[in-house]
Amino acid sequence: MKPFLFLATRSDDEPADAEYEAFLKRTGLEESTLRRLRLESQSLPQIDLDDWSGILVGGSPFNASTPPEKKSATQKRVEAELSGLLDRVVEADFPFFGACYGVGTLACHQGAVVDTTYGEAVTAPEVTLTEAGLADPICAGVPKVFQAFVAHKEAVTTLPPHAVVLGTGEACPVQMFRI
């Protein structure tokens, strides 16, 4: 199996390492099959999609909905690099999993509205899979209703027409989606 690429953007080592460990544990992958690249400290190199099984993007201190004039130079660079990569990922229908900042980044890239309307404090709300979610391979083996830990300063308010909602919640209507 080709490895997966985990793109991280957390500058503090402790939460960055904890997030990577959580992805390793929950995916069942090992460091050799989930390679981490920390974009807050280095530029994204040229990525050949043929070298990877898929790409994962986790959380961040960055917010996709921050006005451009308030974004740091690092955030602007990271977002420009991710946007270029997402152009290729979406065009190739390449496996991509976004959590937290990864959701906001992909959503903004695809023309969604991401703002603080449906932000959630640290909690574990019930997420309900839609009919599309129940039929989607990414949700295979997941119960129709499950609890998920969340902590979103921002969330998707409106998806573009070509996106499909896979999971919804009472306080945040778009918990999971597919492009």
Label each PLM-derived region with a short phrase.
Residues 1-6:
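Extreme N-terminal starter segment of soluble prokaryotic enzymes
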Residues 110-179:
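Pocket-forming structural segment of enzyme catalytic cores
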Residues 14, 64-66, 107:
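Glycine/Thr-rich phosphate-binding loops of Rossmann-like dinucleotide-binding domains
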Residues 22-32:
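A short, Lys/Arg-enriched amphipathic alpha-helix followed by its capping loop at the start of a domain
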Residues 9, 39, 101:
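Cofactor-binding loop segments of dinucleotide-utilizing enzymes, especially the Rossmann-like FAD-
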Residues 32-97:
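Flexible gly/pro-rich beta->alpha loop and the following alpha-helix that scaffold active-site loops
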Residues 98, 102, 107:
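Gly/Ala-rich beta-loop-alpha elbow adjacent to hydrolase catalytic centers
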Residues 11-19:
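Glycine- and acidic-residue-enriched helix-capping/strand-helix junction motifs
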